[in-house]
Amino acid sequence: MTVEYKLVDLAVGGRFWKIKQLASRDQFPTEVEKESIGERVWGADVPESLWPLSGILWPSGILLAQIVASETYDGMRILEVGCGVALASLVLKSRGYDVIASDYNSFAGELLRENASLNNIPAPQFLKLSWQDPYVDEPYDVIIGSDVLYEPGCANEVCEFLKLALKPSGAALFVDPGRAHVRKFETTLQAAGFKCAVVWPVQGEKTRILRIWKNA
């Protein structure tokens, strides 16, 4: 199957955005496409069942972008994990903040650069990063992400990553669409010395906002 795309128009942070994403989640690059641009770019090391997930603009990612569009991060170094289409990173970059977008699928980095160009902003730096083999040159002031608790093991992996990558004075912000592993994540965070505040932005819906910081 040849990879197909579509453009999505939306308003976030007081401006309109044109975002290129996969036309559907039932896609994977052909061998010809991999060879034409290089397997590293296409994320050939990612399983077919997971590969398209990094190319879709999910509701939790839109909510994360809306949140960071209204918050201040002057002088802070920000990392978005599991960025996918990385709308939040694009919004932060458009506001002049120091942000790095990261994902285990290098294809996300290609979309990031294309969407930055579509919206006439500098492309945020992209870092290929996974929970299992994280690379952190120095800790971050702020770590953000959306729908990062998609598997049972993610609760421990994300917590361990925060211990490694978040400054003692730093904070994390995650948007979760209602995954069953949030309670385990909260317990794991508390055991590791973190505090976690959970907010339901819309009454009656499952989506949650998690704000995390280290105990003093």
Question: What residue spans do the PLM features occupy?
Answer:
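S-adenosylmethionine-dependent methyltransferases
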Residues: 1-216
